[in-house]
């Protein structure tokens, strides 16, 4: 069984493992004996964004993430904060996540911080919502960076600078871990990290 999102409860993985059905998680954390994980390097991605902000001289910046319990959001936020100690960072966490959450959070964040120069969103959907929310409010549009590189990120109205996940390599490692686990269920838990890269587009040059 490969679990690819944060939505299914961990109890589902525990149930499969109890039946000795191999489980591999993608971009999710769990300390479960015999459960393998493969994740994008969230910390590397956040550092790439922070370094971009630093090179551009942006010092008043923001972060929008999903809820604090979300594994990927937490890793991206912590690495970003650690890398931006010389910047003023304002943050928002959204219970729902997704486009509408980004739409509302960006409007609130920029209204409270009118001099904001750049905004890092923990997912592309948050970032796309942020762009539209600020445009609709006729608010100043800071540089905006997302994370994922979903197809919509390259759409003309957005041209979103983002951190690209290597989905092909994530899938390759997930299948490899699963097949090995099928052959040897008693192996210790294993974890692999997949590098990411920054894709520069118009939203944050």
List each language-model region with its residue ranges.
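Alpha-helical recognition/docking segments in bacterial nutrient-uptake
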Residues: 1-51, 109-115
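Short hydrophobic segments within beta-strands
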Residues: 4, 26, 64, 120-121, ...
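Alpha-helix capping/helix-boundary segments
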Residues: 8-9, 69, 76, 125-127
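Alpha-helical structural signal in soluble globular domains
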Residues: 15, 19, 75-86, 101, ...
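Hydrophobic alpha-helical segments within soluble ligand-binding/sensing domains
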Residues: 38-63, 99-108, 127, 165-184
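An alpha-beta-alpha
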Residues: 47-87, 92, 190-204
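Active-site rim loops that border cofactor/substrate pockets in soluble metabolic enzymes
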Residues: 88-112
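Flexible loop/turn connectors
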Residues: 88-89, 110-205
